[in-house]
Design a protein with these regions (language model features):
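Alpha-helical membrane insertion/targeting regions
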Residues: 12, 18-244
Length: 244
């Protein structure tokens, strides 16, 4: 082998690394770490509280209050918790510019996981909404139908995002996934609003008031998503078009 063709011992180019090794070498900006930290804090109660429930259903110690629905039919709630955790926590990585622009392979691999997780989260949520028995204090007709509509919409948005990326429509792919993510993060906003209500009023909201607060959380998430789409994604699309 010629000296010019030889590679130094113990070193290799980035192309020689396996996909997992390349993913571990990804370096994020400080603002991206801050964004991930914010998502972790924002999602803490529903995401990690849900994982505690999974451990309980798997035979672990009882920490959270007993949930009769989970004991009678644990599979849907376990699927919902695990898939929602992946979709909300790991899905946040997909919005990082360092991943999207500089590591497209990692973006695609994570994206496939997120697509499956999002669909499982929505489908299991639909199953629980329809088949679990809720008292009027926990779910009235309005909340029932909003959950059904948004669960179906989340699946439709994820499927549309997959179709869009297949046709190289990046804008449609990004907007659809952002809207689906806003729906999937509903539980986090609901937890924040619920805690704020308890601190302000001194008691938990129940009945139609609780339904209204939970619906408002989804409206707020989708409103933020639309603001981000119009302020960040669409201007970038116009800039690319004007450069052609």
């Amino acid at each position: 082998m010629l000296a010019s063709q030889a590679r130094p011992f113990g070193r290799c180019g980035q192309n020689d690394l396996q996909p997992v090794e390349r993913f571990l070498m990804i370096r994020l900006q400080k603002t991206e770490w801050a964004f991930l930290g914010l998502i972790l804090v924002y999602s803490f109660i529903p995401a990690f509280g849900g994982l505690i429930r999974v451990l309980e259903l798997a035979g672990g110690p009882q920490i959270a209050p007993v949930n009769a629905r989970a004991l009678l039919a644990p599979t849907p709630i376990i699927l919902h918790i695990l898939s929602s955790f992946l979709f909300c926590i790991v899905g946040a990585v997909q919005f990082l510019p360092s991943i999207r622009w500089h590591h497209p392979t990692a973006h695609r691999i994570i994206g496939r996981v997120i697509v499956v997780a999002g669909c499982v989260s929505a489908l299991s949520g639909l199953w629980m909404t329809h088949f679990y028995v809720f008292s009027e204090a926990l779910q009235g007709p309005a909340l029932y139908w909003v959950r059904i509509i948004l669960g179906a919409a989340m699946i439709g948005l994820i499927v549309w995002a997959v179709v869009a990326i297949g046709t190289r429509d990046i804008l449609q792919h990004s907007t659809s996934m952002l809207r689906a993510y806003a729906i999937g993060q509903g539980a986090s906003t609901q937890a924040v609003i619920g805690i704020a209500w308890i601190i302000t009023v001194g008691s938990e909201a129940l009945g139609p008031l609780r339904d209204g607060l939970m619906i408002f959380a989804w409206v707020l998430n989708l409103l933020v998503a639309e603001i981000l789409i119009r302020s960040l994604l669409r201007p970038a699309k116009r800039l690319r078009s004007s450069a052609l």
